[in-house]
Amino acid sequence: ALILIGDLPITSLEGNSRAQTVANNLYPNIVQNELTKYRWGFARKKGQLDLTTEVPVGTEWQSIYQLPADLLFLIKINPQVPYGLYGDKLYCNASSAIFADYIYNAPESTWPVYFSKMIEYALAMDFAPSIRDSAASMDANARQYLNASRMARFTDSQQYPVVPITDRPFINVRF
């Protein structure tokens, strides 16, 4: 990303250079933000939630489940029951096993090439004003980022089948 804005690459986020300070402060948030913007197939996980011994306050919920530590975005739970998210806990009225599909903080080693390229442009777009004081560089990288983002989402979507909607309220109401 630094090369894209005309700076020298860094080998570590540790250090006192302007580029290292900016990268160290912005990198984790930019990556996590990009991971949660779309339901990336490579960043999906399915896991069973642990039922806690905590007792919910009030009468709205009966059970509290612990969300996974690496969860960034909850996609769905199974079985499908009403639930509420409070901090790192899931409150619901089920006491059986609950499974969650979610986006996790996928390590760089698992990123496909299309996502890595998109992240490069996202970083360059956000680094440009802080490191280079260049609005022109930011605008150019923003256009590249938008294109890379579209292509990454398209490529990712081609690898995973579409799950059909199983709920048919208009048909069910007739019978």
Task: Please state what every model-predicted region is.
Residues 2-175:
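Glycine-enriched, solvent-exposed interface loops adjoining structured elements
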